[in-house]
Amino acid sequence: MAAASAVSVLLVAAERNRWHRLPSLLLPPRTWVWRQRTMKYTTATGRNITKVLIANRGEIACRVMRTAKKLGVQTVAVYSEADRNSMHVDMADEAYSIGPAPSQQSYLSMEKIIQVAKTSAAQAIHPGCGFLSENMEFAELCKQEGIIFIGPPPSAIRDMGIKSTSKSIMAAAGVPVVEGYHGEDQSDQCLKEHARRIGYPVMIKAVRGGGGKGMRIVRSEQEFQEQLESARREAKKSFNDDAMLIEKFVDTPRHVEVQVFGDHHGNAVYLFERDCSVQRRHQKIIEEAPAPGIKSEVRKKLGEAAVRAAKAVNYVGAGTVEFIMDSKHNFCFMEMNTRLQVEHPVTEMITGTDLVEWQLRIAAGEKIPLSQEEITLQGHAFEARIYAEDPSNNFMPVAGPLVHLSTPRADPSTRIETGVRQGDEVSVHYDPMIAKLVVWAADRQAALTKLRYSLRQYNIVGLHTNIDFLLNLSGHPEFEAGNVHTDFIPQHHKQLLLSRKAAAKESLCQAALGLILKEKAMTDTFTLQAHDQFSPFSSSSGRRLNISYTRNMTLKDGKNNVAIAVTYNHDGSYSMQIEDKTFQVLGNLYSEGDCTYLKCSVNGVASKAKLIILENTIYLFSKEGSIEIDIPVPKYLSSVSSQETQGGPLAPMTGTIEKVFVKAGDKVKAGDSLMVMIAMKMEHTIKSPKDGTVKKVFYREGAQANRHTPLVEFEEEESDKRESE
């Protein structure tokens, strides 16, 4: 009992409350009906699985729970203090608190998770993606405690998780590998010498790495030491192991991976390949299956090589064998991820399978559900990862509330895998992914068209997202042609990050109309509440007897103020003059569900857009795209709210100061590293914006800095003094 009291228990048994919240998720319709019953699976050792603990959070925890419920298996969630009100907690049958927000004290605490499994009487643990999913010690601990680990045996995690070991095993199994150094000597000098031997550019990679963490490209010996130290710090934080390997970096390769499954009976199959070449910060952003332009004979060779890799380590469960492929479709083994991948839904869409169900059945001792001959490839699928990040600021992750969230309608060919709802917070403590948008169609072009259509219907207000960037990417001619590689985003950076275009005058008219109609709706509500229809505050129509009323309105498009003269016509329409052009505007607001729509006609051209007005910004979402128009703050208010930046760099986001390189009195050059922040599982180096002398450092190592707060102050230079005078 004492052990059980170490974790606080939240029994999520309120069926009414849980199902009240689920419809807003827009999850794909299911053919099963959940009833209060359980299903038993018997493992090879005779153990039953009636309850599974998901040792993860967010969308992957919700994904696993849906399949478990389909099979009648009860689900147990774990959560940190930051996730107390999260979606995966609400979906679970039981949920247990396991500590503070930092992952090291919660989701990476093996002892706490094992204790929850015992307390809840869960027979199995599904690790999801990330966290402990590829941790050999955790898999071994589950085995010692008699708990079924839904994943490969600890030996396979060890052999494939240590990249130096995996390369040797793959070479022995006849799988081609990339030239590199995978030795035990981890001294900086040894690694530098091997980098010189291999020849620049090289890739520094964490031995236990994954997800782009602890990975750096080094193009010259001069930058080797700084990049090595940065990779070590990030690897230590993410995997508690800073051992590194060095590999030859192949310019503009393709990243092609193969989904494999093994079982306890010695069987192994492949479920075709996925192309994950388009990446930023060495992390995938859009994936597709099958890989474009791959001929059937190459596809077969890839699959067979992946199966050889799995069999070489007696693999059990879901795994992904990753390859580097050149322009001639020659491929080399890169690594094997011993878990279910984030992008697994695209494989499910083209094969008609449920890979989480396969995981559960195989963990229970069953054979792989289909033979290799029975696994067929149908159609084409894309997955777009929707992140809370700012593409224009080097894809810097952001945190904050999802003030408004609406998604495309889910159907059998459109899936939305998410772990958040409207009103939820994207936390600074975890990965900033909001959702995965997955679409399927009969061929690649049709799937791509569906992807872009669905992205336009994915509307988020409250923080920066990469949705517009994904639209630009998926519409790029080279992407449409299937000419993808890992340097795609850097190569086409200018085209993908187009400068913000000035809004069309017709769009400004729409925004002005939306604001006017919202004001009128608020006035009408006031009238109803005040019960005084003769109050002078009860009308916003602008109508006057015998005269026309004209209102001067100012909106802000980007950095430009736009003057709009709005004349209220007697028939309820509006004449809007912008510069020397006049537009006849008519429209109304209506609601669908929780959303407000603006139906509008500008000079006879009808349109429909979702309208959101939040604080001082008007948001319009339509099939043509989205626009944001600001309502300028009066000068007497803006002067009160303005802040001084104190001449130094600001924190790009909320995070922890990991390393401080400077102190008061130090002279620095523009571009010098000042400090390192850790935020949202990524390391960010703060560089000096100018030459100068450090006057004050506001944070020490280990301190928490809030977004947009000054980090370093510089001494005022003589030129600055003269300008201020």
Curated annotation (Swiss-Prot):
Signal sequence, renumbered to the chain: none
CDD domains: biotinyl_domain
GO BP term, pick one: biotin metabolic process
Pathway(s) annotated for this protein in UniProt: Amino-acid degradation; L-leucine degradation; (S)-3-hydroxy-3-methylglutaryl-CoA from 3-isovaleryl-CoA: step 2/3
Effect on the protein upon substituting residue 366 to K: In MCC1D; uncertain significance
Post-translational modification: Acetylated.
Class of enzymatic activity (EC top level): ligase
Domain Biotin carboxylation: 48-494
Transit peptide residues according to the UniProt entry: 1-41
Gene3D superfamilies for the chain: 2.40.50.100, 3.30.700.40, ATP-grasp fold, B domain
Gene Ontology MF term list: ATP binding; biotin binding; biotin carboxylase activity; metal ion binding; methylcrotonoyl-CoA carboxylase activity
EC number: 6.4.1.4
Entry cofactors: biotin
Highest taxon listed in the record's lineage: Eukaryota
Residues bearing PTM N6-succinyllysine: 581
Cell compartments where the protein resides: Mitochondrion matrix
Post-translational modification N6-acetyllysine, affected residues: 237, 494, 581
UniProt keyword terms in alphabetical order: Acetylation, ATP-binding, Biotin, Disease variant, Ligase, Mitochondrion, Nucleotide-binding, Transit peptide
Impact after mutating residue 383 to K: In MCC1D; uncertain significance
Catalytic activity line of the entry: 3-methylbut-2-enoyl-CoA + hydrogencarbonate + ATP = 3-methyl-(2E)-glutaconyl-CoA + ADP + phosphate + H(+)
Domain Biotinyl-binding: 643-715
Stated name of the protein: Methylcrotonoyl-CoA carboxylase subunit alpha, mitochondrial
Species annotation: Homo sapiens
Biological classification of the source: Eukaryota, Metazoa, Chordata, Craniata, Vertebrata
Gene that produces this protein: MCCC1
